[in-house]
Structure formats: C-alpha cells, structure tokens
C-alpha cells in the first residue's frame, strides 16, 4: 500500500481558530466575537494599526501559542491517519517559535513525522518538496495558492475563510469528517 503524504497546518487548523480573541479583547479593550472574525488578519478585525498589533503579538505570542486548545477529534484523527500515512506539520509560524511548537505537539501527544516552521505563508515549495498528496489548512489564501499549484486541500470552515472554492479545495466542518473525505479522495480505505 502506498502511503499518503499529508501536510497539516497548526494554528486555526488543529487548534481553536479563535484562541486569540479573549487576550486581544482584554489588551485592546475591544469586544469582538468569533462571528466578527471574517478576515484572516487579526489587526484588521480589531481595527488597529499593524504595528500596534505586532507589538501585542511580540509580547504575547508564547502565551498565545502555548495555551491554544486543540479542536475536537484532532488527536484521534491524526493518530489514526499516522498509522498508514506520513504526517507533516507545515506552519507559517516564525522560527523563534520552533522549540515551543515541538513542545506543544509533544505535550498534546500528536503523532507526526516531521515539522516545518516556515516563517512565511507561502507553503507551495515545502508541499512540493514533501510530495504532498493532501494539505489540511484554515487560511483561504494558502488553500488557494496550494490548490492552484495542483495540491488537494481540505479547508476547515471558519468565519474568515467563507469564500468561493475551486475544484481542488474541499471545505470540512469537523475533524471527524476527515476519514471519509480522505477515503473518497484517494479511493482506498487503506489510506485511513
């Protein structure tokens, strides 16, 4: 049986997409909700200058990323997928979050083969390098870029990515749906 190479984003994909709201509301004295998060870029949602948001992020990024909650069923789904497939985490996180990211995945007991911390949202070169069969993502622009490069993408539904999809992108709503989607896409139950 041929193994699939499955690339998975971290923030907003395996973790709660709105993990930042409470801390941002407290810091910026705002009262935004998940439903207000209709854009990917947080400073735009908060209506604050990028520089001001970046100051906040630099101060709190370790707290934000270490305390994120996993989405429901993530651990069990990835564990099952990892039994017959290669799991690669590919994140746009900055490289200074490398140790924290390894520690987070270990603490949450998420199995994987390799972790790639890119420091950029442009994931196509890494997906090519890994011969990616499927990419699981939350960022609409990343999903579009990957899909236009020929990769199949599963896009987890969020308020900020509800835009038109092309034929290489499949929207899903819960991690427990992933088994069936992978099976249909690759027409082999051995993939899961």
UniProtKB/Swiss-Prot annotation:
Transmembrane parts of this sequence: none
Top-level class of the enzyme under EC nomenclature: hydrolase
UniProt keyword annotations, A-Z: Hydrolase, Magnesium, Metal-binding
SUPFAM superfamilies: HAD-like
Gene Ontology molecular function: metal ion binding; sugar-phosphatase activity
UniProt entry tagged with the keyword Repressor: no
Entry's EC annotation: 3.1.3.-, 3.1.3.23
Keyword Protein transport: no
Catalytic function, reaction form: sugar phosphate + H2O = sugar + phosphate
Superkingdom assignment: Bacteria
Cofactor names: Mg(2+)
Function of the molecule: Catalyzes the dephosphorylation of nucleotide monophosphates and of different sugar phosphates in vitro.
Entries under PANTHER family matching the protein: NUCLEOTIDASE YQFW-RELATED
Family of this protein: Belongs to the 5'(3')-deoxyribonucleotidase family.
Record protein name field: Nucleotidase CA_C3379
Origin organism lineage: Bacteria, Bacillati, Bacillota, Clostridia, Eubacteriales
């Amino acid at each position: 049986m041929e193994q699939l190479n499955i690339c998975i984003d971290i923030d907003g994909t395996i973790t709660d997409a709105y993990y930042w709201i409470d801390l941002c509301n407290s810091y910026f004295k705002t009262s935004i909700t998940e439903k207000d998060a209709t854009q990917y870029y947080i400073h735009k949602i908060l209506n604050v200058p990028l520089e001001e948001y970046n100051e906040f992020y630099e101060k709190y990024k370790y707290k934000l990323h270490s305390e994120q909650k996993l989405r429901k069923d993530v651990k069990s789904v990835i564990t099952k997928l990892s039994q017959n497939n290669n799991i690669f985490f590919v994140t746009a996180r900055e490289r200074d979050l490398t140790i924290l990211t390894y520690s987070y995945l270990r603490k949450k007991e998420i199995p994987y083969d390799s972790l790639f911390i890119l420091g950029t949202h442009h994931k196509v070169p890494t997906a090519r390098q890994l011969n990616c069969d499927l990419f699981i993502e939350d960022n609409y622009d990343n999903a579009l870029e990957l899909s236009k490069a020929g990769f199949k993408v599963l896009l987890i539904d969020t308020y900020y990515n509800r835009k038109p999809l092309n034929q290489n992108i499949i929207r899903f709503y819960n991690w427990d749906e992933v088994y069936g989607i992978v099976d249909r896409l690759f027409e082999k139950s051995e993939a899961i």
